[in-house]
Each structure stands twice: as C-alpha cells, then as structure tokens.
Design a protein with these regions (language model features):
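Canonical Radical SAM [4Fe-4S] cluster-binding loop centered on the CxxxCxxC motif
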Residues: 13-50
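Accessory C-terminal segments flanking Radical SAM cores
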Residues: 182-184
Length: 184
C-alpha cells in the first residue's frame, strides 16, 4: 500500500513518551488556523512510500526507539495506508504507537475506514487545533479542546505528563528540524 509522507524523524524526544521514531503523513484539508505543520498540507507534495518500506525505516535496527508516532498532515485522510502501516507495525511487534489527528474521536468513529485503524494503535491525540484555546500539556495536547485516548494497556495517561514539548534536531544534511507540539 502506498502512503504519501512528508518526513521521517528518528530519535525524537518531543513527539510522545520516550525516544520515538516519527512519520508525518502528507496532506491535510482540515486547515486548522495556526497549525504547527502547514508544510504537510499539500496532498501532492511529499513522497510516496510503501507501508512495508515505511515500517522498515521506522523499526530500523540503527534507530532503536521506545515508540512510534504518526502525525501529519492528517494520517486519517489516507485511512487505507494508515491501516496498512499500523497492521504491519503490530505484526512486527513494534513498540507503542501514538497517532495525532485533527479529527474528533466521534468523527473517527463515524467513518468505517478511519474507525478500522483504532484497534491497531496504543494512543490517540485528536481534535482540531484551536489557536485560541490554552494548551493542555498535562496530556500533551497543543490546545485544551484536544483529547488523549489510551487505546491499549501499553501506555498510560501518566506517560504523557511532563514530556519535552519541543526540540530542534540537526539532520544529516545540516538542516534544523523543529519538532514537538505548538508552544504558542
């Protein structure tokens, strides 16, 4: 299954509990004002990768991690690709998977293709970013209207309190990557 992605980052400490390998899906039509990742919105940008190859990169022996984070863009706007990735991660006994979404939980439950993804993730942070709402750092949410859902026994709500909120990583080409959740 092909997935359009924006970026892969390994060794992140500001995208969920522990050291995480992160993928940002490409494409989002939600257009939340003040979005932290506007560069991920264009559905024609980014690059195509198979779910198997993406899984290989996220679980690379050269990039050990405590968890996988899927962000965007909007991962649920590619529900078939997201489901293929989540199933492959589960099949390979990946560490806990956290997914970020701008959809509400009710919206995800209301769409069969999106709902099918939920059993294959360990935690979900969802809801549209609201630049006028204060952050809820105790549950790792950029705006207080967003919710954290624990979907398996592999993570707990307490795992999301006190996390680093942002980081700057210099990649192999010398580019600075700002990552994490919106602080302003």
């Amino acid at each position: 299954m092909l997935i359009r992605i924006h970026e892969i980052l390994t060794g992140s400490s500001a995208n969920g509990p522990g050291i995480r390998n992160v993928v940002w899906f490409q494409g989002c039509t939600l257009n939340c004002p003040g979005c932290f990742n506007p560069q991920t919105h264009d559905p024609e940008d980014g690059k195509l990768i198979t779910s198997d190859d993406l899984c290989e990169q996220l679980l690379s022996p050269g990039a050990p991690c405590d968890g996988i984070t899927v962000s965007g863009g909007e991962p649920f706007q590619q529900p078939e690709g997201l489901l293929a990735l989540l199933k492959e991660l589960r099949k390979r006994n990946a560490p806990p998977v956290l997914v970020f979404s701008g959809y509400t939980y009710a919206q995800l439950l209301g769409d069969p293709a999106r709902r099918a993804c939920l059993p294959f993730m360990d935690a979900l942070i969802c809801g549209p970013y609201d630049k006028n709402a204060p952050p809820a750092y105790d549950r790792f949410c950029s705006s207080a209207n967003q919710e954290l859902y624990i979907l398996s026994g592999r993570l707990k709500k307490e795992n999301f309190a006190g996390l680093p909120l942002s980081e700057v990583i210099i990649d192999g080409d010398g580019n600075a990557i700002l990552s994490g959740i919106r602080l302003f």
